[in-house]
Every structure is written in C-alpha cells, then in structure tokens.
Amino acid sequence: MPLYRKRLRLVRGEGVYVWDEKGRRYLDLIAGIGVNVLGHAHPEWVLDMSRQLEKIVVAGPMFEHDEREEMLEELSHWVDYEYVYMGNSGTEAVEAAIKFARLATGRSEIVAMTNAFHGRTLGSLSATWKKKYREGFGPLVPGFKHIPFNNVEAAKEAITKETAAVIFEPIQGEGGIVPADEEFVKTLRDLTEDVGALLIADEVQSGLRTGKFLAIEHYGVRPDIVTMGKGIGNGFPVSLTLTDLEIPRGKHGSTFGGNPLACRAVATTLRILRRDRLVEKAGEKFMEFSGERVVKTRGRGLMIGIVLRRPAGNYVKALQERGILVNTAGNRVIRLLPPLIIEGDTLEEARKEIEGVLNDIL
C-alpha cells in the first residue's frame, strides 16, 4: 500500500550496520526508530527466537506458559509495578493506559502536551499533538486537551478534579528530542496527587536509552502508569503497560498480547541488556555536536537531537549518501537513536562525519 514515499531498500542487517539491495553498507543510527536496541541479527537473540518458533508461538491469553514467567522475572530486575499488561505496539500500550485511567478514576478528561506523540490509533491519536497526524480522522475521542510542554502555570490551570490523567513523554521524541524540565515533572506529580488524577509516563521511545531503564527515573518521580514498546522486544512487536492499578479481569485483553514468542523476545532482550549493562552504558554515550549550523544538542544517553538553524531534511539525505542513516524529529532536528551496542569509537567517527556534512552543505 502506498502509505510512505519510496525510499532506500534494505535487505539485511548485522550489528549496527544494514545493507541495501546493491550491497552498500550503512551505519544505522536510527535503529528502526529506536527499536533495535541490540542491533541487527544479534546472535543470542536470534537463537532464542528461533528455538521458540520451534516450540510454541501463540497460546492465547487464557493459558499460562513458562515464557511469560521468565519475562516477568527479568522485568522484576528493572521495575516493581504490580501489574504488567502486554500488547503488540506502543500505541496499544497508550490505549490501555487511557482506558485504565478512565476506569480507575471514573473521569474522562485526559491532559496531554503540545508537540506530543503517543501513537496513531484513535485514542492515542487524540493525545498526539501534530495536525498532520490528526487531520482527516476527526472527530477524535472527546475529553482530551493539550497544554504547553514544560509550562508549570498551564499545568496548574489545566489539572483539576475533572482530570482522569495527565500523559507526557519524559523526553519528547517526535516533538524534537525535548527533555521535560524537573520542576515541570514534579509539578505534574504533585498536581495529579492533589486532585486524585493519575500520571502516565509514555516511555515507548525514551525507555532503555537514557542510562536508566525508564527516563522518568532521572526525575525521582513514580508515575501511576508507564507505557513501553519499541526496543523492549528488540524489533519484535510487543508493548508493556505497567501499573499498580488492579484492573478487573476481562476489562482489557488482546489475542496476541503476551504470546510466548513476544515474551521470549522481551525476556531475552532484558537478559542481554542486564548482563552486558547496555542501559547503564547508554547513559555514558551522549554526544554534543558543534558547528556553525548547530544551535544545540538535546537529549540524554542514546536519545539525541541535533537542533539546526535550517531544515534538517537535506542533511539527512546527504548523510544517507555518505552511508549514515538518521532521521528528523521536527523540521530542524536530526534524531539519533542508535543500537545500544554501538561502540564509542564508532559513535565518534559518526559524530565527525555528521559535523562534516553539516558544515559542507549550505
């Protein structure tokens, strides 16, 4: 289906590199938009997934299986939420979070942020900000309103006893790799507690990348609900909604959510991340970029945004021609979301090449 423009055709990947149909190699600094945290074709992950395919793939949500228990055990090394609801994509995790918030509070109003991105299904799209994603799909789900990101006074005015939940990204991804201010996050936590509303942290993109399992950990704040996706399964479609809320059995479900193959993907990914300390190491790999056309560098760890004085599109194309894959996050931001396995010297070489392109192209 012609939903996307024709672009580079990739045929295989290994580690931090991918190859096109002509055999040309590219350094992959976008990793499927933050998905392939272990890189491409990680041998241990591939072996575990291959063995699982020969064992059992889908069992249905009404049955127990060892893979789920193993996944929960691995997850317990990172977080201590009481309940984990599994889906197949980040947008499903957000949909679940919205449902849970409305069910738990008996309220319908959801406060979201300007420049936020939470997904493209109807509920998550209602929390998403950009007009280009929303246009043509109205009317969207009622009860959503947006406030300026990092604006404490706007939050104080918007969050009331009518609010079911506030949803935000600790680091806005599509919005330009913009970290939340500490005062803003703590204000959201205080305000939601004061009025009996819930705080939802969307970690679909920021999870795993900032030096901590969840980016929200940098703020010393515990959300009521956390959504995860993308890298949590290293490329296999899976998502998690984490909460201490007890949702009545049967109120939410998924045919494929929590299937044995998905649980295997998460369990193996988390095991490798923990053993090799890849999450902690990612926090040490943040890079600053400089040059006449660079305004500043934003982000944490391996979630990096290079803010430019000019539109980023031409630079993205030029980097592809030189064998480096990146993408944009807004009109003037180059986004880097490399695999967590990337080595420091490879990153340094990439930084020099990127700065060279930024300086060469008018």
UniProtKB/Swiss-Prot annotation:
It is found in: Cytoplasm. Its main location: cytoplasm. Its cofactor is pyridoxal 5'-phosphate. The modification N6-(pyridoxal phosphate)lysine is found at K230. Substrate binds at R120, S254. It catalyses: [amino-group carrier protein]-C-terminal-gamma-(L-lysyl)-L-glutamate + 2-oxoglutarate = [amino-group carrier protein]-C-terminal-N-(1-carboxy-5-oxopentan-1-yl)-L-glutamine + L-glutamate; [amino-group carrier protein]-C-terminal-gamma-(L-ornithyl)-L-glutamate + 2-oxoglutarate = [amino-group carrier protein]-C-terminal-gamma-(L-glutamyl-5-semialdehyde)-L-glutamate + L-glutamate. Its EC number is 2.6.1.118, 2.6.1.124. PROSITE patterns: AA_TRANSFER_CLASS_3. InterPro entries: AcOrn/SuccOrn_fam, Aminotrans_3, Aminotrans_3_PPA_site, Class-III_PLP-dep_AT, LysJ, PyrdxlP-dep_Trfase, PyrdxlP-dep_Trfase_major, PyrdxlP-dep_Trfase_small. It holds the Pfam family Aminotran_3. May also have succinyldiaminopimelate aminotransferase activity, thus carrying out the corresponding step in lysine biosynthesis. PANTHER family: ACETYLORNITHINE AMINOTRANSFERASE, MITOCHONDRIAL, AMINOTRANSFERASE CLASS III. Homodimer. This is Putative [LysW]-aminoadipate semialdehyde/glutamate semialdehyde transaminase.
